[in-house]
Amino acid sequence: MAECRDLCEWFGVSRTRATIHHWYQSYAKHYEQDFTVELDRIAVDEKQIQLEEEQKAWLYAAIDIDSKVVLHARLSEHRGRDPAESFLRELKEKHCVEDAEFLVDGMGYLTALARVDLSGHLDYSERNIVEKLSQTYTMRISRFHETWNGSQPSAERWLTAYSYYYNHLRSHQALDNQPPLTAVDLS
């Protein structure tokens, strides 16, 4: 958001952080991941996050290990095999993941993968990128939850906007300081 604010100021337009955040939230309603990446290994993870005072949710995220593209991220009120299965079905609808190998950290995921006809195995070493992504989402949500109402729909819009930023704009040192979709020539 700071880059957007700086760019606006460069053009002589002064906008507050809250206004720019509102733009991101508004855009998130219209953003669809309309790209296809050749997928080889996908790391999947879930993490509990704090929304409002007493409300918690589970963040589910999937990222392609090699390209660093965030494939899907969403919130669920529950954790377990059924929400994991629902998440994987959504991922399968959005991307061609049938031939990809899923790296997971729990037996519940293996059952969910089998239920949606996907394959994977337990892996605790090559999943660092999805763990780091979950940590980043959690940190950003806790840092910025005061600028939005903290509800799950609001957090989901923020999650969509941040996933767009991560895939299209955020440079990654491991990708020669390019965003993931630029590095795989899809932006």
Language-model-detected regions and their locations in the chain:
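DNA-recognition alpha helix
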Residues: 1-13
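Major-groove recognition helix of helix-turn-helix-like DNA-binding domains
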Residues: 13-28
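Two-metal-ion RNase H-like nuclease active-site motif
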Residues: 38-52, 61-63
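Short conserved beta-strand segments at catalytic cores or DNA/RNA-binding microdomains
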Residues: 55-80
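Active-site beta-loop-alpha junctions of metal-dependent nucleic acid enzymes
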Residues: 73-97
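Acidic/histidine-rich, metal-coordinating catalytic segments
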Residues: 98-110
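RNase H-like two-metal-ion nuclease catalytic core shared by retroviral integrases
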Residues: 122-142, 153
